């Protein structure tokens, strides 16, 4: 395919135009008085949102250079959202301000590489200042405040704080759609994995279609079970004890499955068969987790254990197990606390050493299942459009609250960035590096200015006023008053603010040091010709 190439100022200005179109659409959502944006969908109802990354993802521009510029800024929003769950709009506003200021200097003859070095040194200093400003999250109220700001809803914030209080900072908080209106929180202690019963005949409550086993034995096997002959010796021992049995295996099929189902229907023996979660090595690891949690052993030929020779003391125990068609929840496993703690530390070490985001995410899930409980926030709404938007806001707010616990909180509303700019006095830079640092100093004002503008106020005046207030004080844009931000609960996780700045600076440096842009040449749409043997294609019928 043919390419088109632009150089120097033409290349940079093309990228900037694309970035400005995207940033202008996103920045109207910033702050408590930010507006919404409506996104048209190819199918179904349009989506209404004030989430920066959702808006950014929808923007596709026609001009090839502008398209590349918009894609670069999308990356800022996406990266910030992935890391911290919020701050996407702040990151976009910072990137736009940095690029605008930087390109002005490049056009005036500044050396782009020196500007880049100045920007990087300034951002490093400001990031350090933000972490120094950060206060540890100590109370449930602080978690509620930060989640409420992210979700723009105090009820959601309080529910997330309640969930984190119950399951701990490493616990799993999932968001599900509910058929009923409103919000509810469901807590499960112990482990939940997303595999349900193999046959609906195992259900003990036919109305809710779930199976509930009290004080069961738990057989954990890393193999398929199809022959009843292999299973019989163990079944007889469990039947003698009078306890129910949960079987977690790669699969249970054939006569083994039919024997279990027939005995369950006749009421002779209560059991449930469930497929093991995960695949390959991950399945092996998760079965090991379940074994440690329940005090059992994984029956696998790899370790010399065969099903037909297995004794009852290799089985795990739990206070209760609830199984639906989609998931299994093991409550209060009988494993030793020391062994569980050892396994948790082992998984933490694996997370530290892993360089794959996917592996790290899966290890984090395993850690959460072992170390914390599981909290499910069920969200309902009047329409499908509102439900999608609400669910997305809750998911972002959960990540935001976890970020607050991780690195602490700073004053929100763009105030932390303004007050972190005091570090510029200590930076000893010269020439174009100093110019690059100055671009960062000016860009730090952009989020507060935009919040003020969205609230119908004069941005420049507000920035000067806030700069002269005591540390931690700033503008409450919802009321127009100047307050102690942290005391009022107007806070941001330090991780969100830091990530927004670092990602914005990273893209800005790329913009400034770009000397050529190579893009696909737009294809002209071919005029539709007439079918063979027909007269001219533009005839009027």
From Swiss-Prot:
It comes from the Bacteria. It is found in: Cytoplasm. GO terms for biological process: protein refolding. One of its GO terms (cellular component) is cytoplasm. The keyword ATP-binding applies. Its EC number is 5.6.1.7. ATP binds at residues 29-32, 86-90, 413, 476-478, 492. InterPro entries: Chaperonin_Cpn60_CS (IPR018370), Cpn60/GroEL (IPR001844), Cpn60/GroEL/TCP-1 (IPR002423), GroEL-like_apical_dom_sf (IPR027409), GROEL-like_equatorial_sf (IPR027413), TCP-1-like_intermed_sf (IPR027410). CDD domains: GroEL (cd03344). Pfam families: Cpn60_TCP1. It catalyses: ATP + H2O + a folded polypeptide = ADP + phosphate + an unfolded polypeptide. One of its GO terms (molecular function) is isomerase activity. The keyword Nucleotide-binding applies. Its main location: cytoplasm. Gene3D superfamilies: GroEL (3.50.7.10), GroEL-like equatorial domain (1.10.560.10), TCP-1-like chaperonin intermediate domain (3.30.260.10). Keywords: ATP-binding, Chaperone, Cytoplasm, Isomerase, Nucleotide-binding. Together with its co-chaperonin GroES, plays an essential role in assisting protein folding. The GroEL-GroES system forms a nano-cage that allows encapsulation of the non-native substrate proteins and provides a physical environment optimized to promote and accelerate protein folding. NCBIfam families: GroEL, PRK00013.1, PRK12849.1, PRK12850.1, PRK12851.1. Belongs to the chaperonin (HSP60) family. PANTHER family: 60 KDA HEAT SHOCK PROTEIN, MITOCHONDRIAL. Forms a cylinder of 14 subunits composed of two heptameric rings stacked back-to-back. Interacts with the co-chaperonin GroES. This is Chaperonin GroEL 2. It comes from Streptomyces avermitilis (strain ATCC 31267 / DSM 46492 / JCM 5070 / NBRC 14893 / NCIMB 12804 / NRRL 8165 / MA-4680). The gene is groEL2.
């Amino acid at each position: 395919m043919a390419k088109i190439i632009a150089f120097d100022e033409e290349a940079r200005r093309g990228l900037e135009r694309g970035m400005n179109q995207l940033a202008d659409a996103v920045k109207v959502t910033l702050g408590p008085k930010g507006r919404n944006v409506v996104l048209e969908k190819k199918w179904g109802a349009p989506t209404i949102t004030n989430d920066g990354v959702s808006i950014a993802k929808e923007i596709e521009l026609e001009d090839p250079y502008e398209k590349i510029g918009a894609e670069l800024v999308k990356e800022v929003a996406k990266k910030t959202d992935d890391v911290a769950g919020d701050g996407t709009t702040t990151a976009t506003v910072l990137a736009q301000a940095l690029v605008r200021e930087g390109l002005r200097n490049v056009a005036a003859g500044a050396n782009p590489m020196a500007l880049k070095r100045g920007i990087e040194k300034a951002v490093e200093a400001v990031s350090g200042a933000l972490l120094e400003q950060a206060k540890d999250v100590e109370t449930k109220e602080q978690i509620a405040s930060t989640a409420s700001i992210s979700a723009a809803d105090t009820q959601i914030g309080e529910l997330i704080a309640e969930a984190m209080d119950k399951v701990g900072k490493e616990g799993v908080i999932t968001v599900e759609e509910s058929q009923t209106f409103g919000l509810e929180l469901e807590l499960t202690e112990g482990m939940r994995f997303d595999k349900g019963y193999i046959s609906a005949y195992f259900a003990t409550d036919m109305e809710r279609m779930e199976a509930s086993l009290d004080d069961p034995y738990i057989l954990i096997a890393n193999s398929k079970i199809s022959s009843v002959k292999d299973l019989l010796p163990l079944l007889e021992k469990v039947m003698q004890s009078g306890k129910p049995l949960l079987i977690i295996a790669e699969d249970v099929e054939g006569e083994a499955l039919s024997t279990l189902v027939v005995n369950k229907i006749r009421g002779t023996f209560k059991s449930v068969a469930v497929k093991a979660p995960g695949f390959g090595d991950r399945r092996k690891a998760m079965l090991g987790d379940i074994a440690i949690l329940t005090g059992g052993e994984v029956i696998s030929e790899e370790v010399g254990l065969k099903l037909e020779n297995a004794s009852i003391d290799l089985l795990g125990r739990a206070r209760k197990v609830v199984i639906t068609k989609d998931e299994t929840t093991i409550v209060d496993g009988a494993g030793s606390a020391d062994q569980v703690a050892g396994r948790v530390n082992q998984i933490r070490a694996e997370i530290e050493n892993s360089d794959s985001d996917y592996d790290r995410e899966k290890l984090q899930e395993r850690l959460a299942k072992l170390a914390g409980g599981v909290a499910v926030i069920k969200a309902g709404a009047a329409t499908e459009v509102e439900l999608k938007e609400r669910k997305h806001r809750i998911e972002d707010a959960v990540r935001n609250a976890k970020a607050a616990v991780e690195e602490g909180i700073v004053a929100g509303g763009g105030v932390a960035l303004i007050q972190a700019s005091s570090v510029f006095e200590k930076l000893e830079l010269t020439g174009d590096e100093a110019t690059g640092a100055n671009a960062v100093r000016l860009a730090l004002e952009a989020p507060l200015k935009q919040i003020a503008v969205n609230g119908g106020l004069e941005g420049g005046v507000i920035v000067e006023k806030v700069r002269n207030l005591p540390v931690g004080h700033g503008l409450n844009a919802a009321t127009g008053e100047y307050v102690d931000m942290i005391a009022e609960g107007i806070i941001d996780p330090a991780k969100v603010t830091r990530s927004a700045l670092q990602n914005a600076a990273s893209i800005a440096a790329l913009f400034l040091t770009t000397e050529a842009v190579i893009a696909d040449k737009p294809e002209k749409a071919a005029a539709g010709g007439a079918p063979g043997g027909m007269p001219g294609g533009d005839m009027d019928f």
